[in-house]
Amino acid sequence: MVISARDFAKLESPERKSLQNIDDFLGLVRSLRWRTCADIGCGIGFYTLPIAQQWRNSRKIIAVDRSTPALEELDKRVDSLELGNVQILQTVSDRIPIEDASVDLVNLGNVYHEVKGRLNFLKEIYRILRPGGTLLIIDWDPEEDLGIGPPVSDRIPRDQLLQNLEFAGFTDMKDHFVFVGHYTYTAKRPIKR
């Protein structure tokens, strides 16, 4: 899904904010070792902005999306918050415009179910992660239908995600509870393959 300006209200609705408590998310991010984070499918910055604010003086955030309106809105918000640690990139292909092995953490928040060619997408994330780097993936759980979010039929089962992570080369998959109605996993790019 490419985000348009009419989607902005839904992306930051009170319902979403109550379901996805950003402090719980930041607690998990705080527990991980990283200096540079790529937020893939960043939209208008639901995850990007809190990460950048929390670590404004010490860490870099690369925000990546396909949507021009979303990135323009994110750029305005970054400017208004005076966040000098955010780099905004637009992708127009299946290749993420980030150098090989250059980030320590990749965040995928409510994005994976939208992706076509999921295995190739995970291989692309593997490419940009440094050896030892972490993928953090949060997505809608098909086993918990709360009446919001994408249709259950569009959601990716946990076992399918875990299988794709393994096929893409990731190891050390760990399940974390962060948000109701979602699953959350971290996975590592191994130091040696």
Protein language model regions, located:
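Class I SAM-dependent methyltransferase Rossmann-like catalytic core
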Residues: 2-20
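Conserved alpha-helix/loop element of class I SAM-dependent methyltransferases that forms part
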Residues: 16-36, 50
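Class I SAM-dependent methyltransferase SAM/SAH-binding core
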Residues: 38-40, 44-95
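A short acidic, Gly/Pro-enriched loop at the edge of an enzyme's catalytic core
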Residues: 94-105
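A short SAM/SAH-binding and catalytic strip from SAM-dependent methyltransferases
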Residues: 104-117
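A short glycine-rich, Lys/Arg-flanked "PGG" loop and its adjoining helix->strand segment in the class I
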Residues: 119-134
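Conserved class I S-adenosyl-L-methionine
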Residues: 136-160
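Core SAM-dependent methyltransferase catalytic element
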Residues: 177-193
